[in-house]
């Protein structure tokens, strides 16, 4: 019975979230045309609405640990579900993503992605994809802010192993900026696919930045170790206190 109730709550949450996305995006579009800063405000308002509505509709609270970045910086984050995107954007001053070019063709996501300076990249052979990404980043570097990349290249369910891709190291080397790792446990509550969401407290943690100057291999090894340990620690906190998850 509890499962059925939670599933119904999850369905209600999903429906109202996408309705809110449509309404907020529609009314926010005119001011977002005027200035990029207004587009950031609209996007952040939606993200904050999602976390607020999740807390009372499905009983899913959110927690931010660590110090979010304030200046220009590369952010490399663990990606478990849409929720970690929401949480990172809600606390990052000027976020812009490395994202699949197909997403920019979507009416709402595409419009706001272009307004805040997200960088579309076509997927293909690894060497070609990296060259395309670096070229796109250089073209988009006129838009200051925090460039966000998911070094595993996809959403990864808790416990699954997916290698870290060299693209993150190539960006780190090309930009010459600090890279802030971000760990999370959100996949325990909000999965990669499906409607069902679990109650609890989902956490992301902004970890100490990795300073520029490391070679690619050393950087990628340190990045993976830092993010995986941080995420495993966050997940262990939840699992140790809630065996049902």
Regions inferred by a protein language model and the residue ranges of each:
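N-terminal membrane-anchoring alpha-helices
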Residues: 1-61
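Non-catalytic C-terminal accessory region of glycerolipid acyltransferases
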Residues: 4, 130-245
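Catalytic core of membrane glycerolipid acyltransferases/transacylases, capturing the structured
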Residues: 24-43, 55-57, 70-126
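Active-site phosphate/pyrophosphate- and oxyanion-stabilizing loops and adjacent acidic/basic residues
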Residues: 52, 86, 169-170
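A generic structural signal for alpha->beta connector loops
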Residues: 59-61, 94, 115, 144, ...
């Amino acid at each position: 019975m509890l499962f059925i109730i939670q599933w119904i709550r999850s369905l209600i949450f999903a429906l109202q979230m996408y309705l809110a996305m449509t309404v907020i995006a529609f009314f926010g579009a005119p001011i977002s045309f005027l200035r990029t800063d207004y587009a950031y405000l609209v996007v952040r308002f939606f993200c904050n609405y999602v976390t607020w509505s999740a807390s009372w509709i499905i009983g899913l609270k959110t927690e931010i640990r660590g110090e979010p970045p304030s200046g220009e910086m590369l952010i490399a984050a663990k990606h478990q579900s849409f929720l970690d995107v929401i949480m990172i954007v809600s606390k990052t001053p000027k976020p812009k993503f490395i994202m699949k070019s197909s997403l920019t063709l979507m009416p709402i996501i595409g419009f706001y992605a272009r307004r805040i300076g997200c960088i579309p990249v076509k997927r293909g052979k690894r060497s070609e994809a990296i060259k395309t990404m670096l070229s796109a980043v250089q073209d988009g570097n006129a838009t200051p802010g925090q460039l966000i990349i998911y070094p595993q290249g996809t959403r990864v369910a808790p416990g699954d192993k997916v290698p870290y891709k060299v693209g993150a190291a190539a960006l780190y080397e090309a930009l010459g900026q600090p890279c802030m790792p971000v760990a999370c446990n959100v996949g325990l509550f909000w999965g990669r696919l499906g409607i069902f969401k679990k109650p609890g407290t989902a956490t992301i943690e902004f970890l100490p930045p990795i300073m520029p100057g490391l070679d690619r291999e050393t950087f990628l090894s340190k990045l993976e170790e830092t993010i995986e340990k941080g995420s495993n620690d966050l997940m262990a906190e939840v699992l140790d206190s809630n065996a049902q998850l």
